[in-house]
Amino acid sequence: MDVYGLIGNPVGHSLSPPMHEAGYEALGLDARYVTFEPPADAGAEAIEAAETLGVDGLNVTIPFKQDVLDAVDPAPLAERIGAVNTVDFTGGTPTGYNTDAVGAVRALDHHDVSLSGTAVVVGAGGAGRAVAFGLADEGLSVRIANRTESKADALADEVPDASGHGLDSLSDLLANADILVNCTSVGMEEDKTPVPADALHSDLAVLDAVYTPIETRLLQDAAAAGATTVDGAWMLLYQGVEAFERWTGEDAPVDRMNGRLREHL
């Protein structure tokens, strides 16, 4: 039996177990997905313990995404982002990947969004870093808007063809943008949005990384403006799909995994 899992603290809320288990069931794989909740200062030790126990792959979530960098051989993208959310133990040395970046790209691609032009990323935290690098690697120009403009500037200095801005620049940035991705947690608060509704337009594709609630105020406003909308569960799904395919070497049964994920939202 192959064993995969998730380390984080806490992990009780995670939707990864049912999503991955649905994939194993659909393909008839002899595999299980389990959760581990080590102490908040023991991320690196947890990676070493998992390797000793013969775990085949791990997802990594808060607060360990940065802590485990020194315990794995990070892939180039994960190293640039400065965070690991997937570990593969099957190659002899634990290798760390960041599938959040790919998750955003594949979520947009699933909705037939053209990955070209200019993208505005709201938020310069962990999710914002991953999405900014992921979109830049697809060839988009990236405009990073953050409440603290200096943090947006610092991230833009690392990302190819990027610039940093304050949130007060959003309306101007979005006027000629093709893609908007919200990487802040603002949408989790009822009726809150980080983006002025009148800045949205029908030529935009809008992805909100928030998936609780599934239809945020931002997505409601975007739909009203005629924009293409992509909810955060698609990004969650595709970061998991990317890990699933890397671990198993199989094409993920995306529809089954998506169905199970949405049952648990």
Curated annotation (Swiss-Prot):
GO molecular-function term, one example from the UniProt record: shikimate 3-dehydrogenase (NADP+) activity
Pathway(s) per entry: Metabolic intermediate biosynthesis; chorismate biosynthesis; chorismate from D-erythrose 4-phosphate and phosphoenolpyruvate: step 4/7
CDD domains per UniProt: NAD_bind_Shikimate_DH
Origin superkingdom: Archaea
Positions of NADP(+) binding: G123, A124, G125, G126, A127, N146, R147, T148, E149, S150, K151, A209, G232
Keyword check for tRNA-binding: no
Binding site for shikimate: S14, L15, S16, T61, N85, D100, Y211
Record keywords, A-Z: Amino-acid biosynthesis, Aromatic amino acid biosynthesis, NADP, Oxidoreductase
InterPro entries xrefs: Aminoacid_DH-like_N_sf (IPR046346), NAD(P)-bd_dom_sf (IPR036291), SDH_C (IPR041121), Shikimate_DH (IPR011342), Shikimate_DH-bd_N (IPR013708), Shikimate_DH_fam (IPR022893), Shikm_DH/Glu-tRNA_Rdtase (IPR006151)
A GO biological-process term: amino acid biosynthetic process
Keyword NADP: yes
Broadest EC class assigned to this enzyme: oxidoreductase
Residues the record marks as active site: K65 (proton acceptor)
Catalytic reaction annotation: shikimate + NADP(+) = 3-dehydroshikimate + NADPH + H(+)
EC numbers for this chain: 1.1.1.25
Xref: NCBIfam families: aroE, PRK00258.3-3
Family, as annotated: Belongs to the shikimate dehydrogenase family.
Functional summary from the UniProt entry: Involved in the biosynthesis of the chorismate, which leads to the biosynthesis of aromatic amino acids. Catalyzes the reversible NADPH linked reduction of 3-dehydroshikimate (DHSA) to yield shikimate (SA).
Entry protein name: Shikimate dehydrogenase (NADP(+))
Annotated organism of origin: Haloarcula marismortui (strain ATCC 43049 / DSM 3752 / JCM 8966 / VKM B-1809) (Halobacterium marismortui)
